[in-house]
């Protein structure tokens, strides 16, 4: 009730933030005259002066006004660009660890230099994160002259980079790279076998460009390093033959069955389910081809893998469509990003889904993979001491940024007032009528000399639009996932008079559409252009620029609404950059997926009740409200999925922190003798307690079992029964002491034989390898736990609490296994004396030999009830890989196959 009044009196929170920063802008401006008077050398010397002042205790906040003034003056001299006052506000927002929302064309890249320069003065490093390698290289090379003028070094991290080159890039003051590369390097560092192999320093400050794309759109997709698992291509091929035989089961709202079938599809959650008839049909089919034993159920424990393959095949056929979710290119299934329309070469769906699509398309089926290390962007970026970001569209997701990352969004005022006109949506009954209206709008705009950008949600739609335009004889360029190599070139010239560009979603994001075209691209295409040629190109561009402005600027036409309002706003933001003229219009139909799935029947009935004729459109607030309500509903559902992923990964993250801390401590230590001694003590205590229960009588002791366990775990045969017979004073505590003394003596004897230096080095390598191997198995176990944990809800149990409880138990067992297996290997192995340099070389060669079987994945995470597809990016890297396992693998906690009655991990599953 009082909120509007208070807002009117005191302004919104955003307005108060901007007003506060304007005071600091005045301080920066006060330094400008002084900076102009400095020579280049004097201006450059300011960087060393600032570093010295920081060393003496001055803070970055205290340096900010003068440092920003230095960066602004350097920008004028080196780049020929002066930071506007609103850009200074953007720089302050970044420095304070917030998100700056800036309209398209307001100079986000230049704004970034302010916060980056100030924070790089600390000497702790700054990471500038972009959405793709092209933008990382472009921005780094664009701003490199400015930073180097100020005495700062710049590095770029890219895939397939030589290790020394990548290490140098991370050692630079400012490092550019993609979110994927920074995340994978973090995982690689935590798989290194020496401190020298690591790349990253402490994670200090990151500036994320297009922060909404990275922290929101890609937040559901974990980063995974994996190795190859067993080959099951025949299974995919056989099941692929069965899926087309299944029929869709359809029910009306009242529950009346209109079509009997085997499976149902929920388009909202993108899930497909077999019904009872479907299960029976599949079981009969699998039995007939020999994949399922007679009378067995798909739900038997040993058939769950088969059930997973069936569902993968079903989803591949019914939920994934060629030229929508993926394309086939060079004999491979290439995924398409639903948010940008870009292809994602190398990225693969997991849980067998990618292989199922390959089988569906009759392509070569690639092997599945096993997780070796993983994290999420949510948890990776929260490792930075300070995080900030820039984007043109963040305000609609402000709640999520604050809830998940603790980041505040500040909307930065535009340098010039926004002149773009955003027209109301036009809604048609059918898609055919909608497309006809779009073509008419295009003709009118082009006749007026306006450039036109048509945004589509899928490749299929863009190709359909292209076909319609070709039929009309209208010249145009298509920018979608199939032609993304030409993105920058096409987008750069999309602002020419009468130019028509069809773009899938936000393809080409990061490159501005300049009215009249981009004259710099024209100059760059010439070989050794003369000053006269450059002047002529500029003059021609100026004429075109003025012509487009007078005709009304860029016209943005959207062929449908996206699930997210933010993506719609990004498309609108293509027009009207830096106060230019422009307009936008969305064309919709009741056949659009968003309207069909989420808009209520009431809206459809309302439109039909109006008696609309063919080709007529409606502009009504009720329809617009219904669309926005549907978008909010989808955004809320997607937020819940991302939040759920984080809640589950937070459990994994705490375990990840413990393991990675243990690993880094081992790597940094020259001597881990104390750690080995602690392991030995813990393993012995656990072994004794297992055979001598607390407060038990000697008659209850399992002495024979204790002797066998000591021999198995420590490689020493001790006559414990004989000791007890000969010494009446041996009770539980004194027996532990005697056992420990014997074990230490045996280990010291091994050390005398091998040499202390050789054994110390060997200890570290063995513990690291045991830790990595068991951690890999633990990750696999945790994955299986998470996939099935939602079923606990049927037993009236909280799945999240159950997951936390069971994962804690599994992690405790993991830590025990690391100790036991490390001691077991060290106790049994025979260490020979060898030159330490030779040993290091041997280990390095071993790691390189295994590297070919490593993969990178950027995978879509499963939810609880709905389990979305897992997306992964597979790239060869120079890291030690897991061995390929072709045999059936027993779980660590299953009974051993030898019949001993022990768990597999405590018997033949221990490292030999």
Curated annotation (Swiss-Prot):
PROSITE patterns: SECA_MOTOR_DEAD. InterPro entries: Helicase_ATP-bd, P-loop_NTPase, SEC_C_motif, SecA, SecA_DEAD, SecA_motor_DEAD, SecA_preprotein_X-link_dom, SecA_SF2_C. It is a peripheral membrane protein. GO terms for biological process: intracellular protein transmembrane transport; protein import; protein targeting; protein transport by the Sec complex. Its EC number is 7.4.2.8. Keywords: ATP-binding, Cell inner membrane, Cell membrane, Cytoplasm, Membrane, Metal-binding, Nucleotide-binding, Protein transport, Translocase, Translocation, Transport, Zinc. May bind 1 zinc ion per subunit. One of its GO terms (molecular function) is metal ion binding. Pfam families: P-loop_SecA, SEC-C, SecA_DEAD, SecA_PP_bind, SecA_SW. CDD domains: DEXDc_SecA, SF2_C_secA. It is found in: Cell inner membrane; Cytoplasm. ATP binds at residues 87, 105-109, 512. It catalyses: ATP + H2O + cellular proteinSide 1 = ADP + phosphate + cellular proteinSide 2. GO terms for cellular component: cell envelope Sec protein transport complex; cytosol; plasma membrane. Its cofactor is Zn(2+). Zn(2+) binds at residues 896, 898, 907-908. SUPFAM superfamilies: Helical scaffold and wing domains of SecA, P-loop containing nucleoside triphosphate hydrolases, Pre-protein crosslinking domain of SecA. It is an enzyme of class 7 (translocase). SMART domains: SecA_DEAD, SecA_PP_bind. Monomer and homodimer. Part of the essential Sec protein translocation apparatus which comprises SecA, SecYEG and auxiliary proteins SecDF-YajC and YidC. Belongs to the SecA family. Part of the Sec protein translocase complex. Interacts with the SecYEG preprotein conducting channel. Has a central role in coupling the hydrolysis of ATP to the transfer of proteins into and across the cell membrane, serving both as a receptor for the preprotein-SecB complex and as an ATP-driven molecular motor driving the stepwise translocation of polypeptide chains across the membrane. This is Protein translocase subunit SecA. It comes from Pseudomonas fluorescens (strain Pf0-1). The gene is secA.
